[in-house]
Every structure is written in C-alpha cells, then in structure tokens.
Amino acid sequence: DPHSVILWTRRPYAEGARQLLTVEVAEDQAFKKVVAHARAPVLASADWTSRVLVGGLKPAHTYWYRFTDADGNGSRIGRTITAPLPDDPRAVNFAFVSCQDVNEGKLNGYRRMIFEDERAAAAEQLGFVLHLGDFVYEVVWYPEDRPQGYYARRLRDVVRYPHGEKIRDF
C-alpha cells in the first residue's frame, strides 16, 4: 500500500508483560510537521518488539519517525519512504544486507552503503534496504575464554587511510 508504512522497534522493560509506546511520523526531521500519531504496544511475549501500521501517508514520500515511552524516553529518529503508486515511472532502488560478524571485520559495508547513498543524486538514492539476516554477531573470543587453543581475531586498526582507496576486482 503506497499510503502506509510498517514501523518496527524494540523497547525492553524490566517489569510487566505489556507497555505502550507512541510513534510520531513527520514530514521533517525536526518534527515540526507531524502528520500521524499511533499507539504501539510492546509485549514481553514478543521480546519487547512492536510493529505498527501507519496509514494516510503520501506515496513515494520521505518521512521521519520516532517512538516514545510513557516517561518521554525516545528512540533514535528514523527515516522511511512510502512505496510509489503502481504507475509511477521512477525507479525504486533496493539494497540488501545480511547477517554480519564483527569478528570478520567487514562491517564497513554498511558505512559504505550509507556514504554512497547520501552522496547520490536523488533519483539514484536507495528507497529500501532489505535485511535478509537477523543477527549482527559481536562475540570476540580471548585466549582465556578458549583454553583449547581456538582464538578468533581481536579487532584492531591495522592501518588508517585518510581517504578511501579503490582496489581493482575487490
């Protein structure tokens, strides 16, 4: 539906089985033009996650959103875009990512994707990023953790470049 988006968040609570969040959707990042409010239940039985359908939006339009709890604590501000109408001739650009392992040291792909998207012409910017996996693994094993002799790499900067370098066939 090009007039709606599904927004998702996770907000753990120490007590209770159900809490309510408020989600606001705005046409500007400063939330001066809020166009929608919705209540979003978070449930212990769903790992304190919530999904909320927000309707009444413009097709192919960028919006900003945030979740707040009853105490006024807020999430980071997110950005979303509604789908275009079926007869919209403009291209819709997708990217996909999958599970990542910090131990392998290849998380710079996310940074590169964002960097290139922010600098692209509007018609070339990403409309959607689909995450195919469900984890970012962040376990780093240290020698004292694995006395049997298996040691993964510790994360460190080997070299820092002031500017990116293009590597042929990389």
Question: How should each PLM-predicted stretch be described?
Answer:
Residues 1-170:
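Divalent metal-dependent phosphoesterase catalytic cores across multiple superfamilies
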